[in-house]
From Swiss-Prot:
ATP binds at residue 288. Zn(2+) binds at residues 29, 227, 252, 256. The lineage of its organism: Bacteria, Pseudomonadati, Pseudomonadota, Alphaproteobacteria, Hyphomicrobiales. It comes from Rhodopseudomonas palustris (strain BisB18). It comes from the Bacteria. This is Cysteine--tRNA ligase.
């Protein structure tokens, strides 16, 4: 099966041909560990996890190398460390911030069903590679030293003869456009407004290392050089796929291309560039000032990992996504129906999931893949539905629908639809009579029996609004049962 991927550089969808099919290599920009990851950060992690799974399926698990970095040296980290741990030396405070944030990131993305990358390098472990690349760039005339800074010159890159790409080609911008749109307050040590920092001197107390290019004072790397160095160390001078969010195309990825191609005299850093679209919340840009800033951890409290992952994949990765409560609720209900079916169903042909595979092979078209899953559910092909969910990395089970706030099942409240007493239970929103809960459960059971799923879903939502969460199953005789819990 041919894999076709959209390349940001060429602006076209092309057949994917790895440089070495026995060693398929992919690099994705990872987190800067200064704050908990928000739900927008989860999008590239999930998208490229699906691609990683697909590549492993096509080429074999032992023939795919996936690198996703950890940026652990950055001004934002320094600022957070100073704010959160004012009584500690800065380096010790930085270590606390980065360790805590990295642990939370791993907890979050592991919960979302994402495989760990083959290699997860930290920037601070690759300072030597950064200095080596910078020295090459200075020696080649592509970078210069000024006031203990090392700066890259896009003008020098575009003036060079040979196979080097033009600076701005990835973002489809010309240098003239960049110069015209540049800020007026340009640092005095820059020769040109488009020059960017490869290395800078450290302030007292900040992390610092011996500088490249013969600079006597110690310093630290700029952001862009970090990824060039880590990709070179673990994937080589040229590799197959470089991914990240659309916001990274310029300047970050453009600068990576410039650094790597000029240092190693190559025409491309990666043969395919892939970028996922923006995420907004309820039709608005996510912002702390708007009060709609959603961390992955917050969303895990409210929604199960299967809901978060499937909801993310319903939109094609290159399209913008609107993250809404309504869509999450719809996704949860759909998964509930699928998982209820899978609890009791068996049989079918797993090869029927080839439609899911074909959709993924067409530029990772997860929305089409999910449409194929709906067909398998409609056809009651449990084997194909399971296989397709596995390809998408969706964990199967009712426990993966509910968020962490819905974790405790009341012992006295766990009863089948035919039972129940008259005790009153306090929920997050009201006091509820057990008999009222039972009446609604009975009405919902009747709706399900006549296959009126719209009414069944309405009653489930009504109970959820009351703070009651339902769990459907079957008894020993195979008859439907419903248990409930109070959302805490």
């Amino acid at each position: 099966m041919a894999l076709r991927l959209y390349d940001t550089l060429t602006k076209e969808k092309r057949d994917f041909a790895p440089l070495d099919p026995s060693n398929v290599r992919m690099y994705v920009c990872g987190p800067t560990v200064y704050d908990f990851a928000h739900i927008g950060n989860a999008r590239p992690v999930i998208v490229f996890d699906v691609l990683f799974r697909l590549l492993r399926h096509l080429y074999g698990p032992d023939h795919v190398k996936y690198v996703r970095n950890i940026t652990d040296v950055d001004d934002k980290i320094n600022d957070r460390a100073t704010r959160d741990f004012p009584g500690l030396p800065l380096n010790e405070a930085i270590r606390k911030v980065t360790e805590q944030t990295e642990k939370q990131f791993h907890d979050d993305v592991d919960a979302l069903g994402c495989l760990r990358p083959t290699i997860e390098p930290r920037a601070t472990e690759h300072i030597g590679e950064m200095r080596s690349i910078i020295d090459r760039l200075v020696e080649g005339g592509f970078a210069y030293v000024a006031e203990d800074h090392v700066l890259f010159s896009p003008q020098a890159m575009n003036a060079a003869d040979g196979i080097l790409p033009r600076y701005g080609s990835l973002a489809n911008r010309s240098l003239d456009e960049m110069i015209a749109g540049a800020r007026v307050d340009v640092a005095p040590y820059k020769r040109d407004v488009t020059d960017f920092v490869l290395w800078k001197p450290s302030k007292p107390g900040e992390p610092s290392w011996p500088s490249p290019a013969g600079i006597a004072t110690q310093g630290r790397p700029g952001w862009h050089i970090e990824c060039s160095a880590m990709a070179w160390k673990h994937l080589g001078e040229k590799f197959d796929i470089h991914g990240g969010g659309i916001d990274l195309v310029f300047p970050h990825h453009e600068n990576e291309v410039a650094q790597s191609c000029c240092a190693f005299h190559t025409d491309r850093m990666a043969t395919t560039w892939m970028h996922n679209g923006f995420l907004q919340v309820e039709g608005e840009k996510m912002s702390k000032s708007l009060g709609n800033f959603l961390t992955i951890s917050d969303q895990r409290d409210q929604w199960g990992p299967a809901v978060l992952r499937l909801n993310m994949l319903k939109t094609h990765y290159r399209q913008p996504i609107d993250w809404t409560q309504h869509n999450l609720s719809e996704t949860g209900r759909e998964l509930d129906r699928w998982f209820e079916f899978l609890e009791s169903a068996s049989g079918g042909d797993p090869n029927d999931a080839n439609d899911v595979m074909s959709a993924l092979a067409d530029d990772l078209n997860t929305s089409a893949a999910i449409t194929a899953l709906r067909v398998q559910f409609k056809n009651k092909n449990s084997a194909a539905l399971r296989s397709g969910l596995d390809l998408l990395g969706i964990p199967i089970g009712r426990e993966f629908i509910q968020g962490r706030k819905h974790v405790r099942l009341y012992a006295e409240g766990a009863f089948v639809a035919a039972g129940g007493g008259t005790a009153t239970f306090s929920t997050a929103s009201s006091s509820v009579e057990r008999s009222d809960i039972q009446q609604l459960i009975d009405a919902r059971a009747a709706a399900r029996a006549r296959k009126d799923f719209k009414e069944s879903d309405r009653i489930r939502d009504q109970l959820a609004a009351m703070g009651v969460v339902l769990k459907d199953g079957k008894d020993a005789d195979g008859k439907p049962t419903t248990t409930w819990e109070i959302a805490r």
